[in-house]
Design a protein with these regions (language model features):
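Gly/Ser/Thr/Ala-enriched C-terminal appendages of enzymes
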Residues: 12, 23-28, 33, 41-209
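Active-site-adjacent beta->alpha loops and helix N-cap segments on the catalytic face
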Residues: 13-19
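Residues that form or flank phosphate/diphosphate-binding pockets in enzymes
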Residues: 1, 16, 44
Length: 211
């Protein structure tokens, strides 16, 4: 079922037309024939089709996935966090009137905290690169923008989120096969709470700084 060039009216009829097509195919003895819907689909359109009883076996998702249409621009900028002087690392900070542009000095390391009982992700946080989180002890974290928002985390597991890819210009990382990458991504999504994953009014996932 392809909506290319036929406008939004046709696109809104995909659920209905897929049901009609399924019946026609089945009546003709082509029960094993699959129906694919494509063209500018995203998770919201796919959800609507499914809720409308669309008889679609697979969805072709193209530009909406490739370009991340809801957030097409990543506002990322490299900022100096430290310099080496006389063999020592000296932290550096950028000062700005805009709080969001003030950097955290020195080399850093991201972590993810998981609830030990449920396995669900609690929060992501940033520490200095040489720090190690002792997850046998309570841990206090706070929001970097609203620093009065603090939380004591207990009964958790702390896992670092980065691995070394290059060392002195040489690749030291063995890239896993795509099947393993896919499996890992699915497992990580399963660690998120349903309230974070829902389409409408999702809870904000916590990204914090440790104390």
């Amino acid at each position: 079922v392809e909506s290319r060039g036929l406008g939004d009216v046709y696109k809104r009829q995909i659920a209905y037309l897929s049901r009609k097509a399924r019946k026609m195919l089945d009546d003709a003895g082509f029960e094993d024939c699959t129906i694919v819907a494509s063209n500018s689909l995203d998770e919201y359109l796919i959800r609507d089709m499914i809720s409308q009883g669309a008889k679609v076996d697979s969805f072709g998702v193209g530009e909406r996935l490739i370009t991340a249409s809801s957030s097409p621009v990543l506002g990322g900028v490299y900022k100096l966090c430290a310099v080496e002087k006389d063999g020592k690392i000296c932290p550096r900070i950028k000062i700005s009137d805009n709080v969001a542009k003030i950097t955290t000095p020195c080399f850093k390391r991201p972590w993810r905290l998981f609830d030990r009982e449920t396995g669900k992700a609690i929060a992501d946080l940033v520490t200095l690169n040489n720090e190690v989180i002792d997850d046998t002890k309570p841990y206090e974290i706070f929001d970097p923008d609203f620093t009065w928002k603090r939380k004591i985390v207990e009964n958790y597991v702390a896992k670092p989120l980065t691995v070394q890819l290059f060392k002195e210009g040489e690749c030291v990382y063995k890239f896993p096969p795509l099947d393993e990458v896919k499996k890992y991504c699915a497992e990580q999504i399963d660690t998120l709470w349903d309230e974070v994953l829902r389409f409408d009014n999702p809870h904000n996932y916590l990204s914090l700084i440790h104390i």
